[in-house]
Amino acid sequence: MPAFNRLLPLASLVLIYWVRVCFPVCVEVPSETEAVQGNSMKLRCISCMKREEVEATTVVEWFYRPEGGKDFLIYEYRNGHQEVESPFQGRLQWNGSKDLQDVSITVLNVTLNDSGLYTCNVSREFEFEAHRPFVKTTRLIPLRVTEEAGEDFTSVVSEIMMYILLVFLTLWLFIEMIYCYRKVSKAEEAAQENASDYLAIPSENKENSVVPVEE
């Protein structure tokens, strides 16, 4: 099992690399919504294009709304990165892709005051010969910042299952030991009874029980 657990991540990476090389696709993965104070937090925003070969002018706008407040612009991508004046100034980092399908940003040194609702607006104007359609997508990320990292539910369940398995194996081994001990004890008792019965036979019967050998 340990060897299998070590090989599984490697096999997954190889499979992902093979899929990305042979079948380049865009997957819209949702962003994480919990961060720990003092760490960096990636706000993931992915807006896939159905026709990647079509050229498009892309504009990205990131907004932040504190609890009980209003939305205000904190980051903008328009022909290049542009961090606007806001309480996040100096703590935002572009983390997107060259094709602008991944337009994520990273918040550095997250604070408790960074909790709130983040909005990612992606506006695209496609350049066709006959017309120039305009498409806009929006992603909402409710972020909650905590002082300490909470326990992962999956790891807790895995730990509980591990302890249950250890208890089960211990009980099974204990039962097997008792079964083997009783089996050996019964075999020894049977051997002792046979020996006692043989010793209890009179010597005359022992001599008579000897079969004469004809010459």
UniProtKB/Swiss-Prot annotation:
Q: What is this protein called?
A: Sodium channel regulatory subunit beta-3
Membrane topology, record value: Single-pass type I membrane protein
The gene behind this protein is: Scn3b
The Swiss-Prot or TrEMBL record describes its family as follows: Belongs to the sodium channel auxiliary subunit SCN3B (TC 8.A.17) family.
Per the UniProt entry, the glycosylated residues are 95, 109, 113, 121
Organism this protein belongs to = Mus musculus
UniProt KW keywords: Cell membrane, Disulfide bond, Glycoprotein, Immunoglobulin domain, Ion channel, Ion transport, Membrane, Signal, Sodium, Sodium channel, Sodium transport, Transmembrane, Transmembrane helix, Transport, Voltage-gated channel
Please name the GO terms that the record assigns under molecular function.
sodium channel regulator activity; transmembrane transporter binding; voltage-gated sodium channel activity involved in cardiac muscle cell action potential
The free-text function statement in the UniProt record for this protein reads: Regulatory subunit of multiple voltage-gated sodium (Nav) channels directly mediating the depolarization of excitable membranes. Navs, also called VGSCs (voltage-gated sodium channels) or VDSCs (voltage-dependent sodium channels), operate by switching between closed and open conformations depending on the voltage difference across the membrane. In the open conformation they allow Na(+) ions to selectively pass through the pore, along their electrochemical gradient.
Which InterPro entries does UniProt cross-reference here? Ig-like_dom, Ig-like_dom_sf, Ig-like_fold, Ig_sub, Ig_V-set, Na_channel_b1/b3
Q: Which residues lie on this side of the membrane: Extracellular?
A: 25-156
Which cysteines pair up through disulfides? They are 26-48, 45-120
One GO CC annotation, please? Z disc
In this protein, which residues make up the domain named Ig-like C2-type?
25-138
Q: Which residues lie on this side of the membrane: Cytoplasmic?
A: 179-215
